[in-house]
Amino acid sequence: MGEEEENPNSIDILPELLEEVLLRLPTKSILKCRIVSKQWRSLLESSRFAERHMSLQNSRRRILAAYNCDCGGRRKLLPESRFEGDEEIVYLHCDASRPSMTCQGVICFPEQDWIIVLNPSTSQLRRFPSGLNHNCRFRIGLWKTFSPGNWVMGFGRDKVNGRYKVVRMSFAFWRVRQEEPVVECGVLDVDTGEWRKLSPPPYVVNVGSKSVCVNGSIYWLHIQTVYRILALDLHKEEFHKVPVPPTQITVDTQMVNLEDRLVLAITRVSPEWILEVWGMDTYKEKWSKTYSISLDHRVVSWRRQKRWFTPVAVSKQANLVFYDNKKRLFKYYPVKDEIRCLSLDICVLSPYVENLVPLPLKPSHPHPTPKNSDFEMRISRCRLFSTPGSWISKILKWNVMTLEILFTSLAIVGYICLPL
């Protein structure tokens, strides 16, 4: 009687087998399964599981678009995705006029006083002070110069330790008639919530330049009399120069991460409309032209419009999905040399992959949803999300979730126990 008797009805599942089964569940089901047991929660919240899950999700990347709304409601994914042609579009409820940066399914929103980091897949949100002193003293008085328009921002993930980091370079003129600005550089570690100073870059890049994170480095494109590409290794936290492709760059050139490769999309208007796509081998830092698409009379007319085009995805058949600054989405089929319009009204943000990597919340972090902030959990005026219901509706919702978890658990047990 001193020893506990084993329950003959219990089923022991090997952790390795359980992990393989859970990896193949939809993300929503995975999140709900965390409350089944401590063992399941520990497994599902491990960095190993998150990395393996993201590797599997990379094979079914989708497109993230803004459900453009300035209602002031919380930023979150719409419940259901939609298809434009055969491309799956995931919509984020947000104000598309505000700047944003994405990396592997996590989004960063830089604001005047705060840096907001959001994982739409898990609904985790963190906010951090911008780390800047907005008041700069000049000889002729006190000027407010530190607005987001005076920053060069970057957001990415350290490929060595997996930490997300935010980079900002601010430019200030401390004296009247000062030719070169004073550059202040800093990096925010999302895990610790702390800012650290960086050594200045070898040269200044355009204020407001969009950043791209590829393979653990953030890149910026500088376009003036000469064009340059600046890179920051997020693990070493060191800047370095990157060679440019052997072609002419236009002021409307867009730099993106296309299938884990640094890409420049160049829109040419003379002698005809052409979209050129150049990709760089990250390790050799050598460029090659991967697409040259004629746009005349298919996408644009001969009228000289302010137009540029940005690639967003490549299908398994090497078909290129791209969009323009007029909210139109296209797909190019190289074999047929054909362009199809998938949507006439869409605000594309970036490629999207579901990501279960947690955003740590530590006592030193500010509360993610301060009162009277733009991120307070409240009802959206656009009526996208249901209002908080009565206690009866809450009980029904809880019962539905419990049943989903029960059926998932039974499916796993059946998958493991049924004879082959």
Curated annotation (Swiss-Prot):
Residues 7-53 form the F-box domain. The keyword Repeat applies. Gene3D superfamilies: 1.20.1280.50. InterPro entries: F-box-assoc_dom_typ1, F-box-assoc_interact_dom, F-box-like_dom_sf, F-box_dom, Kelch-typ_b-propeller, SCF_F-box_component. It comes from the Eukaryota. LRR repeats lie at residues 112-135, 226-251. The keyword Repeat applies. Keywords: Leucine-rich repeat, Repeat. This is F-box/LRR-repeat protein At2g43260.
